Swiss-Prot record:
PROSITE patterns: DNAJ_2. It holds the Pfam family DnaJ. InterPro entries: DnaJ_domain, HscB, HscB_C_sf, HscB_oligo_C, J_dom_sf. Keywords: Chaperone. Co-chaperone involved in the maturation of iron-sulfur cluster-containing proteins. Seems to help targeting proteins to be folded toward HscA. Coiled coil: none annotated. Belongs to the HscB family. Residues 5-77 form the J domain. It comes from Azotobacter vinelandii (strain DJ / ATCC BAA-1303). Interacts with HscA and stimulates its ATPase activity. This is Co-chaperone protein HscB homolog. GO terms for molecular function: ATPase activator activity; protein-folding chaperone binding.
Length: 173
């Protein structure tokens, strides 16, 4: 499998829109082939190579499974590494981040589980809009700035989703 792209590992074309079921099925097929148990009696070198390939498949799968990671990966394939400093230069985005974090803090302070559920539904809608926007522009070099901006926003939503999950766990206890 060598240095093939994450997409090539799974026989997929590089695209933001992926058939997640096909990706999962292909992942399971490939991982079964290199599972360490299959190489238990093999020479040490083969065991190590199988373990390395399993780790590579897992990393590729995790990257392609996540919309924000997939977006960053697609941009990196085109030579675009996202800089964190650019996020700070987007005042509207910074304001939105602050407002969402304040709202989440208020939900935590009030222990409002129903409010957290509504907040999470809004985030899911926001994520779907970002995904559609990125899918429409990532491959167009003229819209690269927009694709990078959307990918950064996806990252922010990922972090916010993680905070929401933590809050849900605390409120459920």
């Amino acid at each position: 499998m060598g240095n093939a792209s994450h997409f090539a590992l799974f026989d997929l074309e590089p695209d933001f829109r992926l058939d997640q079921d096909r990706l999962a099925v292909r992942y399971r097929e490939l991982v079964r082939r290199v599972h360490p148990d299959r190489f238990a009696g093999a020479p040490e070198r083969e065991q190590r190579l199988a373990l390395e390939e399993a780790a590579r498949l897992n990393e590729a799968y995790q990257t392609l499974k996540s919309p924000s990671q997939r977006a960053r990966y697609l941009l990196s394939l085109q030579g675009e590494e996202l800089s964190q400093e650019t996020t700070v230069q987007d005042p509207a985005f910074l304001m939105q981040q602050m407002e969402l974090r304040e709202e989440l803090q208020e939900l935590q302070d009030s222990a409002d589980l129903a409010g957290v559920a509504r907040f999470k539904r809004r985030l899911v809608q926001d994520q779907e809009q970002l995904n559609e926007g990125f899918a429409a522009c990532w491959a167009d070099p003229r819209r690269r700035d927009e694709a990078e901006r959307l990918a950064r926003r996806m990252q922010f939503l990922d972090k916010l989703f993680a905070e929401v999950r933590q809050l849900e766990e605390r409120l459920d206890d």
